[in-house]
């Protein structure tokens, strides 16, 4: 008898365990990416300045035009 035959029943089990781990790992990353994207969209929609450590929130009005004196500011990584 060959010693290889002892490992034959474990091959499908190992394949199932590895494939399940890969699927769970990929699913978790996709879920976390989606949650982060939704959180950023929520903060941008609500102009959630508290996310950046400021004291007040200002709602975004979709039809309003930006003021002429509007300047571009760099957003820190803490907002995301």
Swiss-Prot record:
Main location, first listed in the record: host cell
GO process annotations (BP): symbiont-mediated suppression of host innate immune response
Disulfide bond sites: none
Transmembrane intervals: 10-30
Its membrane topology: Single-pass membrane protein
Function, in words: Plays a role in the down-regulation of the host NKG2D ligand MICA by utilizing the lysosomal pathway for its degradation. In turn, MICA reduction diminishes NK-cell killing of HCMV-infected cells.
Protein name as annotated: Protein UL148A
């Amino acid at each position: 008898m060959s010693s290889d035959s002892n490992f034959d029943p474990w091959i499908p089990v190992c394949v199932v365990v590895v494939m399940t781990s890969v699927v769970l790992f990929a699913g978790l990353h996709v879920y976390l990416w989606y949650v982060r994207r939704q959180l950023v969209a929520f903060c941008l929609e609500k102009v959630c300045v508290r996310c950046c450590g400021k004291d007040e929130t200002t709602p975004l009005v979709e039809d309003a035009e930006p003021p002429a004196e509007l300047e571009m500011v760099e957003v820190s990584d803490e907002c995301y």
